[in-house]
């Protein structure tokens, strides 16, 4: 994260994204060529490093573009990411059914990505390069940025619970038939994507603070319904609410962090992302640990409390308005 932030602020997100995006798909293709565990481990390492650079750069682009439009649009960009996830899954399914090898699949994606970057990099926002050459390499997040990071941490923990444990929850707690085990995850993803495409209009009408306050309550309500009524219909509705609740949080946090007046957007986004991704990494193992001591319903109840914490933190935040 600090390296990505330094590169974005020194050279600008446009330059970094134009370089990182083609390298990202090269790293992806290298995964398909891995012939040993060491090769795979190194490939995954570079895939993560370059992917993080692209992530910070593209989110900085989103923040800078939103500033130019002077209205909420960043949530829709994240909606496009959600749609790309669905598209990637469908393409992967098609490739499997056609018996195409992973490296061939990845090479097709690499070619399409290169074409995309070649024709569209000129439309990226130039942004501003950081002129402060004495800025320290690592800046500890504090104050409003730390608060934003904790809000994002809670939201990412809820996302991680859905990504990694929704299938297990539907199988072991809801006791859904095998054909419906993926229903919870699918309903969550659909509502998260839908929420992101309508989120900007909601933020414009209701305000960012009220929208984020409501999102925390919606996350908690969704988790509560899933825990208290562990049947297929209620759990599906609950997971849909969680998807709707988390849909606007991360884009909103990035937008607010990128508008701070003390440090460049790239560094601010890296700070917030460093804290938030801990939620994505720590949330699922925490759920597994608690469920091993008791059961998965208690784990989901705890994640539901994170939603209320989001509402409290947003209410107390002076940076969010």
Show where each model-derived region lies.
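Conserved MFS/SLC helix-loop-helix module at the cytosolic interface between two early adjacent transmembrane helices
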Residues: 1-38
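Helix-to-loop junctions at the C-terminal end of transmembrane segments
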Residues: 1-12, 96, 195-207, 291
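Intracellular juxtamembrane helix-capping segments at the cytosolic ends
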Residues: 53-67, 248-261
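Structural signature of the two symmetry-related core transmembrane helices
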Residues: 15-29, 210-225
């Amino acid at each position: 994260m600090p390296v990505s932030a330094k590169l974005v602020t020194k050279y600008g997100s446009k330059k970094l994204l134009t370089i990182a995006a083609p390298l990202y798909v090269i790293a992806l293709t290298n995964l398909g060529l891995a012939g040993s565990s060491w090769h795979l481990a190194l490939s995954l390492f570079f895939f993560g490093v370059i992917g993080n650079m692209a992530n910070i750069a593209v989110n900085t682009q989103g923040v800078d573009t939103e500033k130019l439009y002077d209205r909420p649009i960043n949530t829709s960009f994240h909606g496009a990411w959600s749609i790309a996830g669905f598209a990637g899954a469908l393409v992967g399914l098609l490739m499997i059914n056609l018996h195409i090898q992973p490296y061939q699949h990845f090479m097709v994606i690499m070619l399409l990505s290169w074409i995309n970057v070649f024709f569209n990099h000129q439309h990226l926002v130039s942004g501003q390069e950081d002129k402060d050459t004495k800025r320290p390499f690592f800046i500890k997040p504090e104050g409003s940025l730390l608060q934003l990071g904790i809000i994002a941490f809670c939201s990412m923990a809820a996302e991680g619970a859905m990504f990694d444990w929704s299938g297990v929850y539907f199988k072991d707690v809801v006791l859904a038939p095998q054909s419906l085990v993926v229903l919870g995850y699918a309903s969550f993803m659909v509502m998260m994507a839908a929420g992101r495409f309508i989120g900007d209009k909601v933020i414009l009408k209701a305000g960012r603070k009220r929208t984020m306050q409501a999102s925390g309550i919606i996350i908690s309500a969704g988790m509560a319904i899933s825990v208290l009524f562990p049947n297929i219909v209620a759990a599906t509705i609950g997971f849909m609410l969680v998807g709707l609740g988390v849909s606007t949080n991360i884009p909103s946090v990035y937008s607010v962090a990128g508008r701070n007046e003390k440090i460049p957007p790239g560094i601010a986004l890296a700070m917030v992302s460093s804290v938030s991704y801990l939620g994505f990494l720590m949330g699922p193992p925490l759920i597994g640990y608690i469920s091993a001591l008791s059961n998965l319903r208690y784990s989901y109840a705890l994640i539901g409390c994170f939603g209320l914490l989001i509402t409290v933190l947003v209410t107390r935040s002076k940076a969010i308005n």
